[in-house]
Amino acid sequence: MGPAFNRLWAGSIVSNLADGVLIAAAPLLAITLTDSTVLISIIGAMVMLPWLLFAIPIGALVDRVDRRFILAASNAIRSAVIGIVALGIATGHVTIFWLIASAFVIGICEVANDTTAQSLIPQILDEEHYEKGNSRLQISETVIQGFIGSPLSGFLYALAMWLPFFINSIGYAVAMLLALSIPIQYLQDVRVESSKENKPHFVEDIKFGIKYLYNHKVLRRLVVTTATIGVCYSMGTATMVLFIIKELELAPKYFGVILTIQGLGALLGAIVAPKASKKFGRSIMMTIGITGSSVILLAQGFAPNIYIFVALATLGGFAIAQWNILLMATYQTVIPNELYGRIHGTRRTLVWGMMPIGSVLGGVLAHYSLRLPMYVGGIIASVIAISSIKFFMSIASKTEAAQ
């Protein structure tokens, strides 16, 4: 796949290890700081809110500067913020509001990191390798986060509450160094040399990204549909840690193990996605992924015990991994590389930027019943996905024709 992709992949592996540790430790820390379902859901909302506020300008920035520096800066800031949280825990000064503020900053860095990484794929790989490249990144994310990061987090958390956050901070620092070592020629260098005098203003870049997506009818519908379903997913999962621990009565020390088991489905989905797409067609597998995961979200609300819940979550992970990998390959095929940052930023503003609404709604619904967010989110997502099957089934041919 080449040295550029290998460095990107290595950085992704390290940052995913840090993410896995944080994903398991942060909810456990949160429920020791507050019993409020609304405050806990706000943490998830704060991670997603930057997609609404900053994805478009960050996307434009990604198309204008050396992308290594954006990756490095985002990891450096995450390292510093989580390091401060670890210090706050160790000294007994951390509060739920401190955690909420940190989640917002981490969310901004996630916007920059994700947008930049996705923009690099079509720059460093040939089109026929898009699905393979995305699959490798997804597999490493699933394996490292789910099978190493989460169990490691539980072990570290048992030793000392601050320890997983300290390790998380170190991981992001290493990812920063790896990002700076990626050996590729960047688009900005080409743009400056070829059109230095006519280089568009930053604001014009932002406007162009919005206009491009709006005028592309197929991409526009795909983004709007995905964004709506994303709100439902966010609603259904906002307080899931409380559901698992309080409703299904799982001991907190086993929470990381549950995340690991759930990751099996996502791992299998990531491995199978490129081969299944080649054999059955991208449109068919995308349709199965989005529809199946929506129905499974609803079914999770009816889980009578932790065993049924984990089985459903594992199937859901398989379906979502299929969808994510093939969706990214579709976007990377359709959107011109030199425009990818702007278009990706606009798309993520709608898709991920709307998720905080779902998180807050999920927290409000959970106040009445911890199962209610999954009922409501699952029903709405399933209705939208099923009613869009015809569109999803034709998505590959439509996007190719729309180019």
Question: Which residues does each PLM region occupy?
Answer:
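Helix-breaking motifs and short loop linkers at transmembrane-helix boundaries and internal kinks
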Residues: 34, 66, 88-89, 303-304
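Substrate-agnostic recognition of the 12-TM MFS/MFS-like secondary transporter fold
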Residues: 6-23, 47-62, 66-81, 98-157, ...
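Helix-loop boundary and gating motifs at the non-cytosolic
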Residues: 1-50, 215-260
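Alpha-helical transmembrane segments and their helix-entry boundary regions
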Residues: 8, 24, 39-41, 70-71, ...
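Hydrophobic alpha-helical transmembrane segments
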Residues: 96-101, 107, 132-191, 260, ...
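Membrane-helix interface/capping residues of multi-pass secondary transporters
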Residues: 5, 37, 67, 96, ...
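Juxtamembrane intracellular "pre-TM" segments in multi-pass secondary transporters
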Residues: 1-6, 185-224
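C-terminal transmembrane bundle of multi-pass solute transporters/carriers
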Residues: 53-57, 70, 74, 84, ...
